[in-house]
Amino acid sequence: MRSGDAEIKGIKPKVIEEYSLSQGSGPSNDSWKSLMSSAKDTPLQYDHMNRESLKKYFNPNAQLIEDPLDKPIQYRVCEKCGKPLALTAIVDHLENHCAGASGKSSTDPRDESTRETIRNGVESTGRNNNDDDNSNDNNNDDDDDDDNDDNEDDDDADDDDDNSNGANYKKNDSSFNPLKRSTSMESANTPNMDTKRSKTGTPQTFSSSIKKQKKVKQRNPTEKHLIDFNKQCGVELPEGGYCARSLTCKSHSMGAKRAVSGRSKPYDVLLADYHREHQTKIGAAAEKRAKQQELQKLQKQIQKEQKKHTQQQKQGQRSKQRNVNGGKSAKNGGKSTVHNGNNINEIGHVNLTPEEETTQVLNGVSRSFPLPLESTVLSSVRYRTKYFRMREMFASSFSVKPGYTSPGYGAIHSRVGCLDLDRTTDYKFRVRTPQPINHLTNQNLNPKQIQRLQQQRALQAQLLSQQQQQQQQQQQHHSPQAQAQASTQQPTQGMVPNHFPGGATNSSFNANVSSKQIQQQQQQQQHKSQDTGLTPLEIQSQQQKLRQQQLQQQKFEAAASYLANATKLMQESNQDSHLSGTHNNNSSKNGNNNLMTMKASISSPNTSVNSIQSPPSVNSVNGSGQGVSTGINVSGNNGRIEVGIGNSVNPYNGRIN
């Protein structure tokens, strides 16, 4: 034992010393594994049992089997009682213990004769063993195929013998020998010879198994003058000779085949020619097969069409019969009409092409709208609907220009939860801005034509808005100008009657003429754009020009409005002076004359009117602070008018806005 084992197992050192194999003399063995070699090499001490010990320790009737593991047990089955019996106990069994023979009398001479033959057979087993072994050895020298055939023949012969023996035994023939088969088997399975069973069940000796080793088949090497190196491998074999296989030999490498001398062309060229020749044959055969397959397919299709035609005819006949039977009884008639309609639908069903099927499937997929059964809720439905209603209420409350859509969904839709079919997955609703209404249908127009129409509509909308603004401004200008004319005519009493109103009317007339001209130009441009079709850049340039014209119009209108305000202020100041009674007629005349000269100068912008920027009669009347500071600056070069109007002052030194 090792010290490591002692430490692991916890054995005391005294016990190890007492029971150790070495006992302190010599080196100790590591373990029992070191004794395996000596145990295998030592032969068996007892090959057989001693007869004296058997007689001494066992009964005389006892039978012991020597070496039962190394040698097979030899036994036979009794045909009368079906019990397995050893070869040495068959006679005793038949004489004393066989149940099948107990019913018969022991004095039968036939039974005695059979027992004698069995004894003779058992005694002769030892003599026949050697003969059988020799015969088996001679038979086993043949090839594998011959051995199998011989074994099968032997089995057939044995079966025939068994049948004949059984028949003779049934007839109580004295020549019957039930141990004929057993003796042959016993000879094959003698204890002194190593045996082995074949696949067929027949025993074979150890010597025959050694001789039955399979040999590797090799091609017979041929001589050099018998080989065509242009068609055969031609590699030298180690046994001598050359390989006579074809150029596609798999047992030799490509390098060895290329190194062979004696070829008219290189090996690769010869191999390509070889493949070409064989592939042509293969290609012709493949073409024939393809033609045959096509013919078979056509025949199958014709057969299928014929079957369909026959089925349709049968269905039509059945439907006619059902219609005839349906006229006899009302119930059967109703059923037959239903079946008839189904059959007609089945017969008249249109077969769709694969393209139509794909289009239908794609249409179905595009129109499908799967909705989830459950989704995340960011806010409650109540708050969401309230927010949506309030938003739509505000959107629908504001006024929208004519020709544009309303931003909201409407009075009814704002009260319920709307669903935008264009964007169903959006959690929030889009804010809809007012958009122009398309009165005309744009179904048969190109995208470029649609873009042009939209641009033209935008220009028309701008022009309409400009015209409306101009009309409103003109209405506002007419009312103050009429009042100013009436007020000026009363105090002047015929003095220079045509200067002031003439200037005002001329300015308004000029403004109206200019606006009309601009409108005409815009209309002409619109007609031209509709006829020719302008590009987006040209349309933008036209829009810029229109904006510049609008700015100029606004400037002229602003100047006219300033003049109207100045006249109003002057009238108010004159009324205040008449009420107070402190003004003189001369001063009023001078003031009126100054105003008339000022307006006349304004009506003719080319004249220089620097002297009338602040007349003393207007700014200060009789040295008092009552007056109006107009602050009109006119530049003679450009003809631009800058009007600066101050605040009027009442007699109590208070400003009038």
From Swiss-Prot:
Annotated positions binding Zn(2+):
78, 81, 93, 98
| Ranges for domain SCA7 | 220-286
Which Gene3D superfamilies does the entry mention? Answer: 6.10.140.670, Classic Zinc Finger
* Key word Cytoplasm present: yes
Quick one: a GO cellular component term?
Answer: DUBm complex
Acidic residues composition bias: residue spans: 131-163
According to its UniProt record, where is this protein located? Nucleus; Cytoplasm
Segments of skewed composition (Polar residues): 174-193, 200-210, 504-516, 572-583, 600-636
Q: Where is the composition biased (Basic residues)?
A: 306-321
Offer one example of a GO biological process linked to this entry: positive regulation of RNA polymerase II transcription preinitiation complex assembly
One Pfam family from the record: zf_C2H2_13
Main location, first listed in the record:
nucleus
Q: One MF term from GO for this chain?
A: enzyme activator activity
The extra comment attached to this record reads: Present with 486 molecules/cell in log phase SD medium.
Name the family. Answer: Belongs to the ataxin-7 family.
**Name of the protein in question:** SAGA complex subunit SGF73
Q: Which organism is it from?
A: Saccharomyces cerevisiae (strain ATCC 204508 / S288c) (Baker's yeast)
Q: What is the lineage of its organism?
A: Eukaryota, Fungi, Dikarya, Ascomycota, Saccharomycotina
